[in-house]
């Protein structure tokens, strides 16, 4: 557990975060710009040191990183003793060292022995051909891959990411996202990931800290935070849910995965790249705008996925739009429909209806 | 017309003084410049002012105060005598102390602005990868500012070679101990030995010229290396008060 209690005043900006963050999987720190995300990350990293008289504390799995209370003097564990790695927007490679020496820099300063292997990391991040180059001669995406490799090779107990994709173009973003999805599963190193991008949040996060104007609004698992109609995420234009589950079978003829939702229900997910049934659980995203509601299951429809659900909550957004929360066994869906539809169909909480899902994105392994 | 043995002694002494002073200046000046580049301490302007003073003060003023500090009844000088068994006034050690103070701004100022141009996040990243402060200095800061460091060292070296006022006040004119080129030259002129003065003046001129040539050649190369950190385009040789 990362135990944080921060009460900082920086000019007119107040940052108040008192919470516990799980130290497995990916925890995203999410919020609009100037909500204090990076400030919080920098304090956790030790990059900015809070005022010595302010009451703050941070401990990581019972290792004290920062402490000040009325009984104890100020304590700040130096950055180099925290066993963290930090990946910024701009990669921040050491420009006087080749890629290989940048990676060696991390390996030479490990505080504990590790079986994270140089060649393995280079292969996974496809940087073998870059090793002799200087950072200035790399593209943005290449630099970021090297920065991530360097972070992993330092064998950290936590990796902090400060919007690592925001300086990249669309192709590079996609590639780095893919690497990040793979890496956090392979190494079991917790990630603390600052972003304001909902797409990145849905793809990577297991857990979310929601910040607004320096205040912690929510600290919940990704599934809960996306489907909580009282939180701003469900109200956004591209709101949606993610569903994780096991694959029952792979239909080779149509390139479809059959995702088990429990209780005899399933979803068909198109996967053009699959050759066989994946062994692991998968994560999918369903946008609220892609889910419509019918009172009876349409039998003659091009839509593959029509499943029985129960309405658990209805919230009117604005401009005649509404978000409806739907339960299917223990999975949740959101549906964005017009307020007029709700009135015409007479939708009420507790009603059994059918959800027609027009589009599902396969995000990767869960 | 050739250099006399006394002149050669003076040249060697000058080189020795410049070398020792430059070495000490790097040891003191680089950490000091790093501290100044990073600190937000309230005494920073005070320290910067003190370091810059030799740029505008006549060297004789510095020399005068050093002379007083070196007098045997002074606390500092008497302790020095106790620890090292030699007096500071009219000694090579005294000259080194004077040169270091006199040339300190020539190392600290360019290095401070060099260090200020290295993004803070670079060193923080090094720290997160496990580098402590000393490690950061040797593995990141020093290699990234290699050019500036060489230029600053050359400048300090050249500046120390040309020193006169401070030496005049605290060094006296003892051959082999404190008689540097500028003092020997002054002697020659005083005794109307213009031929010897010419040779010595020319030697100092040539040495200074090549020192500066090295600095500007480095500066030029630094500029052509567009992106690299620690380029020396800021280099300015200031007018000292002499």
PLM feature spans:
Chain A
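Conserved ABC ATPase "signature" region
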Residues: 63-66, 113-130, 181-182
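ABC ATPase NBD coupling module
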Residues: 64-85, 109
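Conserved ABC ATPase signature
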Residues: 134-138, 142
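A short, proline-enriched helix->beta-strand linker immediately N-terminal to the Walker B motif
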Residues: 153-157
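Catalytic Walker B motif of ABC-type/P-loop ATPase nucleotide-binding domains
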Residues: 159-163
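Internal alpha/beta loop-helix hairpins
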Residues: 181, 185, 195-265
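Glycine/charge-rich catalytic "coupling/switch" loops of P-loop NTPases
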Residues: 265-315, 332, 336-366
